């Protein structure tokens, strides 16, 4: 670990670096570190390694401010509870969603959280590939994601659309969360072989 402290006027500027090798946390350990409301997820288990850069200021009254955090994460395994009703588009969706072999960049600054990443995901019975960007500003949550579905089903009843069993479907979603259990899909695009569908809501 590295730690640097600079004094300017009546404030201390503190910055540091910290590398973590393979950390495993269960649900209770995670709750002791990060508020569930901040993450917006009910995480059951996580295994990861990370490179962390952080900085913050401390005033003469020992009040912390301007906290910034940059993390590069190698996520081996993440399991969280599926709290969203997505069975109408992912017919075989699981009660627990699993992320494996993810490369993630996380940035936290002034109550704003952004996460970008890519890797494997078990939404249904087989592995799919996923890329994503998550933005959380106070009570607002946005998700932009690309999901490549190969051996899993996908359906859109509204358009009477069903994925071909032997083809690869590229699904792009722009989603906003309005409360803990409700998602609004702003844009959905599908690409399967020569078929393309774009839906803006």
Enumerate the language-model features and the residues they cover.
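Membrane-proximal interfacial segments on either side of biological membranes
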Residues: 1-201
């Amino acid at each position: 670990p590295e730690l640097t402290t600079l004094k300017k006027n009546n404030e201390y500027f503190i910055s540091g670096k910290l590398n973590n090798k393979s950390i495993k946390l269960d649900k209770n350990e995670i709750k002791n570190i990060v508020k569930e409301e901040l993450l917006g997820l009910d995480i059951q288990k996580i295994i990861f390694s990370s490179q962390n850069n952080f900085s913050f200021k401390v005033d003469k009254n020992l009040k912390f401010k301007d906290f910034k955090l940059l993390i590069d994460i190698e996520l081996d395994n993440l399991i969280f509870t599926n709290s969203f009703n997505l069975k109408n588009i992912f017919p075989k969706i699981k009660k627990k969603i699993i992320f494996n072999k993810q490369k993630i960049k996380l940035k936290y600054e002034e109550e704003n959280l952004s996460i970008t990443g890519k890797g494997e995901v078990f939404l249904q019975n087989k592995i799919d590939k996923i890329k994503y960007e998550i933005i959380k500003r106070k009570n607002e949550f946005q998700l932009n994601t690309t999901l490549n579905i190969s051996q899993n089903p996908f359906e859109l009843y509204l358009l009477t659309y069903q994925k071909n069993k032997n083809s690869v479907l590229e699904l792009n979603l722009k989603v906003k969360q309005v409360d803990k259990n409700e998602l609004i899909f702003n844009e959905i695009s599908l690409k399967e072989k020569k078929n393309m569908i774009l839906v803006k809501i």
